[in-house]
Amino acid sequence: GFGWLLSLRESVRNDKLLAPNLYLGGPIWNGSELDWYATVVRDPERARSLVREHQAAGYDFIKVHNVLKPNVYDAILDEAKKLNIDVVGHIPHEIALSKAIASGQRTFEHLKGYYSDRSLEITKEDYVGLTKGAEVWNCPTLYTNRIGFRGDDVRTLLESDEAKYISNDERGEWLAATAGG
């Protein structure tokens, strides 16, 4: 999300705009500059400072992405716990699923933390055993990532009924990314 959404949420809360309740996070946090929409966080003190800034601004949660060093991730979760603000999002590549659960991250996007955690045998029992009673939510959203998982042809995917939910900009990016091969 972006800062302008905070004022939109206030309009909803003050009955100036008829809309559903908005629960907002700021831009996703990542250790890489490759995601143009991400806030780059590479050191623990900046991470702690950003948690405080986001909490003071009124965001409901912090969303983390794939490329965060363990010490930065730990600082985010520690500071967020102190300030009672949820951390949601991806499980960073260098973080084990068991650590993400123990640290208090509230949601896991795309189930990546499960299938990329090399400490698991990837059995039903592993999934259930790690998450049962952990008070975490999984947001699978796997369909739109199907290309990366199974190598499906982009054009075939974009012709499916479900593809109507993919924006024209995103369609263009997918087609451009596969044009060379």
Range-by-range predicted roles:
Residues 50-68, 114-181:
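Active-site neighborhoods of metal-dependent hydrolases
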Residues 1-45, 59, 64-131:
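Active-site loop-helix segments enriched in His/Asp/Glu that coordinate
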